A protein has these predicted regions:
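Positively charged, low-complexity intrinsically disordered leader regions
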Residues: 1-52, 56
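Fold-independent oxyanion-binding glycine-rich loops
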Residues: 19-20, 45, 110-112, 141-143, ...
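Residue-level detector of flexible, active-site-proximal loop/helix-junction positions
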Residues: 11, 72, 145, 176, ...
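Glycine-rich phosphate/diphosphate-binding loop of Rossmann-like nucleotide-binding domains
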Residues: 44-66, 159-216
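Generic structural signal for well-ordered alpha-helical scaffold segments
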Residues: 21-25, 155-159, 189
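Phosphate/diphosphate ligand-binding glycine-rich loop within oxidoreductases
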Residues: 34-40, 48-159
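Exposed alpha-helical structural elements
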Residues: 12-15, 129, 212
Length: 216
């Protein structure tokens, strides 16, 4: 698996959880694995837990970490081909992704949905464009439609607290000061598809997830 964009059917989640649990017991066992390697963290949106945990994971693997906040520290990027670069966007994704690839061995990206254009959000233009033009592996630290790192962390938590009987797990919504995309919920649903549990989604009317995610 070169890229980690979303939870896919070919991902052995149970094996991944087992490896993660082993690393929790011996966090420095692979500290030479990332020696002389650089992880680039590109943030188009704020982050607390994902940023700190990803940086900590890289350090435990012996990697160096470079962080860039694109919202305040970089030129605005143009993602459309054939666009005349005479407006507010000074950098094209073709060149930007190649530059980042020269300095980083792995690139992790956080880019939320705009919540203004559903079709454009679902196209995952930021993540998919970097995946297309970068020459190094891409990791999703939360995008418009998915948060696979969070889903893996949730799977680890469930494993650690799993009862002896088949549990009932409920996914529901809670109030938040800001409108949020479905990324976390989408990935949680995909993660639960591989769990032996009575899984229920409950929510106010009008706040449904995409049927393409929940139909399974």
């Amino acid at each position: 698996m070169k890229n980690f964009i979303d939870l896919t059917e070919d991902l052995d989640l149970h094996k991944l959880v087992q490896e993660a649990q082993a690393l929790k017991k011996e966090p420095c066992v692979h500290e030479a694995l990332g020696k002389r390697k650089v992880l680039g963290l590109l943030f188009f949106n704020p982050s607390l837990r994902t940023r700190l945990s990803t940086q900590k994971a890289a350090k435990l693997l012996g990697m160096e970490v470079m962080v860039m906040n694109f919202s305040s520290e970089a030129w605005a990027i143009e993602y459309e081909d054939g666009t005349v670069m005479s407006g507010l966007r000074s950098e094209h994704i073709r060149e930007a992704a190649q530059v980042v690839s020269q300095y980083c061995d792995i690139v992790a990206i956080r880019a939320f949905a705009s919540l203004t254009d559903q079709e454009k959000d679902e196209s995952e233009i930021v993540l998919r464009s970097f995946q297309k033009y970068a020459s190094v592996p891409i990791v999703n630290m939360e995008s418009a439609t998915a948060h696979p790192l969070q889903a893996v962390a949730d799977a680890i938590t469930l494993k650690e607290h799993w009862p002896s009987h088949k549990p009932k797990i409920v996914l529901s919504w809670a109030p938040h000061p800001k409108a949020l995309p479905h990324a976390v919920a989408n990935s949680f649903v995909k993660m639960m598809a591989s769990q032996e549990a009575d899984f229920v989604i409950t929510h106010p009317k009008g706040y449904e997830l995409d049927e393409k995610i929940t139909k399974g």
